[in-house]
C-alpha cells in the first residue's frame, strides 16, 4: 500500500516537472529569440535561435532614428502612469467602501459591475468611436486614459473588495474605540494590510496601455499620437523589408519600465501582510 502511494506520488511529481519544463520552454524560447534578435547586426529570422550573440545597439539606434519610437514611448508612458495612479486610487477607495459600508444600491451596483465585464471590448468599439467623434477626442490621450480607467474599475473593484473583506472588522472597531476617524482607520489600519493587492492592481493598470493594440489603434490615427504597440505594428506592416530586429528592440524597451515598476513594488507583496495590525 505504501509502495503504491509512493509510486503515485512520484508519478505526479514527474508529470508536474514535465509540465513545468514544457511551459518554461514555451515561454523562454521566444523571449531568447527576441533578446538575441535585438542585439544582432542586420535582419534576422523570426523563427531561428542563433547562439552567436552580438552586443550591437544599431537596432536600437535605428528604431529611434527611422521611426517616431521616442514619441510613441513617451505617449505610452504618460498614459500608463496616469492610468495607474487614477485607476488604483479609485479601485482602492471603491473596494474599501464596498467592503466596510452598507449604502443604497450596494448589491445592485456590484451585480452591475459583473454584467459590464460580460461585454467584450470588441463589442463596444463602435460606441467608443462614436463617443470619441462626439467629444472630438480622436488622437487624444486623455480619452484613452478615460477608457482604460473606466474599463478596469468594475472587475478590479470586485477583487479589491474581496481582499478588503479578509481584513478583520475587529481592527476597525478597535481603532474606532481609540478615537480614529474614517480616514485614519482606512489610511493607517486597513490600507497597509492590503498593500499586496494594491501593488498588483497598480502593476496591472500600468501594463495595460503598453500591451493594448485594439483600442488604441481604433482611436489613434496620426503617427505622432501612436502608442508603442500601434507604432511598432504600423512600422513593421509598412516596412519594405520585415525588420524583426527593430521590432525586438522595441519589445525589450517596452518591458523595461514594467520590470522596473515590478522591482519597486515587489516588497509590497509581502510587507503588507504584517505592517498594519499594530497601528492605531
Curated annotation (Swiss-Prot):
One Pfam family hit: BPD_transp_1
CDD domains per record: TM_PBP2 (cd06261)
Membrane-topology descriptor: Multi-pass membrane protein
UniProtKB keywords: Cell membrane, Membrane, Sugar transport, Transmembrane, Transmembrane helix, Transport
Family in the record: Belongs to the binding-protein-dependent transport system permease family. MalFG subfamily.
Gene Ontology terms describing biological process: maltodextrin transmembrane transport; maltose transport
Major site of localization recorded for this protein: membrane
Functional note: Part of the binding-protein-dependent transport system for maltodextrin; probably responsible for the translocation of the substrate across the membrane.
Ranges that cross the membrane: 15-35, 77-97, 110-130, 142-162, 200-220, 244-264
Molecular function as annotated in GO: ABC-type maltose transporter activity
Taxonomic superkingdom: Bacteria
Name of the protein in question: Maltodextrin transport system permease protein MalD
Organism (species): Streptococcus pneumoniae (strain ATCC BAA-255 / R6)
Classification via PROSITE patterns: ABC_TM1
Cellular localisation: Cell membrane
Gene Ontology, cellular component aspect: plasma membrane
Ranges for domain ABC transmembrane type-1: 73-265
Amino acid at each position: 500500500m505504501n509502495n503504491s502511494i509512493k509510486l503515485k506520488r512520484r508519478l505526479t511529481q514527474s508529470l508536474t516537472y514535465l509540465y513545468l519544463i514544457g511551459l518554461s520552454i514555451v515561454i523562454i524560447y521566444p523571449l531568447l529569440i527576441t533578446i538575441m534578435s535585438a542585439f544582432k547586426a542586420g535582419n534576422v529570422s523570426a523563427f531561428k535561435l542563433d547562439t552567436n550573440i552580438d552586443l550591437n545597439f544599431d537596432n536600437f539606434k535605428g528604431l529611434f532614428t527611422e521611426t517616431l519610437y521616442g514619441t510613441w514611448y513617451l505617449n505610452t508612458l504618460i498614459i500608463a502612469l496616469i492610468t495607474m495612479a487614477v485607476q488604483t486610487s479609485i479601485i482602492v477607495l471603491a473596494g474599501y467602501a464596498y467592503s466596510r459600508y452598507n449604502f443604497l444600491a450596494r448589491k445592485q451596483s456590484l451585480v452591475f459591475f459583473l454584467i459590464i465585464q460580460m461585454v467584450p471590448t470588441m463589442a463596444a468599439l463602435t460606441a467608443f468611436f462614436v463617443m470619441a467623434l462626439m467629444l472630438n477626442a480622436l488622437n487624444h490621450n486623455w480619452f484613452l486614459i478615460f477608457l482604460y480607467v473606466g474599463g478596469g474599475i468594475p472587475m478590479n473593484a470586485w477583487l479589491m473588495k474581496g481582499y478588503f473583506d479578509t481584513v478583520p472588522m475587529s481592527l476597525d472597531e478597535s481603532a474606532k474605540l481609540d478615537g480614529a476617524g474614517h480616514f485614519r482607520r482606512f489610511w493607517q489600519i486597513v490600507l497597509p494590510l492590503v498593500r499586496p493587492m494594491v501593488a498588483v492592481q497598480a502593476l496591472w493598470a500600468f501594463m495595460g496601455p503598453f500591451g493594448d493594440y485594439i483600442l488604441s489603434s481604433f482611436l489613434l490615427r496620426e503617427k505622432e499620437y501612436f502608442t508603442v504597440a500601434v507604432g511598432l505594428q504600423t512600422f513593421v506592416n509598412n516596412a519594405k523589408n520585415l525588420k524583426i530586429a527593430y521590432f525586438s528592440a522595441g519589445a525589450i524597451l517596452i518591458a523595461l519600465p514594467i520590470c522596473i515598476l515590478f522591482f519597486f513594488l515587489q516588497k509590497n507583496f509581502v510587507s503588507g501582510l504584517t505592517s498594519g495590525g499594530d497601528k492605531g
